[in-house]
Curated annotation (Swiss-Prot):
InterPro entries on file: Toxic_anion-R_TelA
Protein family (similarity comment): Belongs to the TelA family.
Designated name of the protein: TelA-like protein SAB1262
Organism, as annotated: Staphylococcus aureus (strain bovine RF122 / ET3-1)
Amino acid sequence: MTENKSFKESHPLDDFISDKELSNTTIQKEKLTIEQQKQVDTISKQINPLDNEGLLAFGSDLQKQMSQFSHQMLDEVQSKDVGPIGDTLSDLMSKLKSVNPNELNTDKPSMLKRIFSRAKSSINEIFSRMQSVSAQVDRITIQLQKHQTHLTRDIELLDTLYDKNKQYFDDLSLYIIAAQQKKLQLENEKLPQLQQQAQQSTNQMDIQQVADMQQFIDRLDKRIYDLQLSRQIALQTAPQIRMIQNVNQALAEKIQSSILTSIPLWKNQMAIALTLMRQRNAVAAQRAVTDTTNDLLTANAEMLKQNAIETATENERGIVDLDTLKRTQRNIIETIEETLIIQQHGREERQLAEKELQQLEQDLKSHLVNIKGPNKQS
């Protein structure tokens, strides 16, 4: 930001006025150019001695222009509120921060299903949110471009106001120099003549003319002071205009930086982060597929080994196991032996039964014989 002193030192007419008190400002006429001196002489002739009304109007047009200029400056400052620009920039920063690339960098254990479904869903959600924010950022960008256009116009307008203010300063400086030149002329030439004439005359009006001239010189001195005040206002206005311009320029540069740097960088970084996340998920998916393939190969190899062992074992076995043959033979022998025993028991029982039957038959015959004998005797 340019300091007030630099504006003052940079002005071409500042060298004509010393750094004493404002009311005691003196003119360094030797630093005037020939053209400026001609202008001063012309302006000085506008001051007619004892013309109080003309003295009151001396430089008043410039002061009126200064007053109008001050109102224009006030309107410019009041109508250009930079608050919305700051709010728009803050809104932009808020939108840019609402989607954090770190959200794409979550390292958590995941299964194959999570990688292909949940992770994909998470990326899509963030991508959808990023698209929404990007659309909002684009709308904010349009607002910022409008603000930048207004700021650029304001800067150009302030340049015009600065040039006008500089012209007021230049003109007031010449009017002050002309008035001071006229004052010196009246004090050194006209007033002594009137004083000498009054001393040599007995006419009281000559004495009144001396008093009137002294009062006119006093009014001229006060008029010079008023013009110096106006000039000082113009001098102080210059850095104020530049400060407003600097603020507008800084805002315009900030907006341009946001539009041309921050926003494209944000979009690039989000695209890069999303691409890296997709790559990482692809690698994780490939790793999961590889791990699953290895697990399947290992399981299949283990199953093949078990099947081979069992097959070889079965191949080495006979159709009928020896133990089975032994157990079968033992069962057959036991069956034969039990059958023989049963047959022997059956034979013995039959023999016993035959003996009993023979005995029964014999008993029956004997009984029958006994029954026939008594019948014959009777």
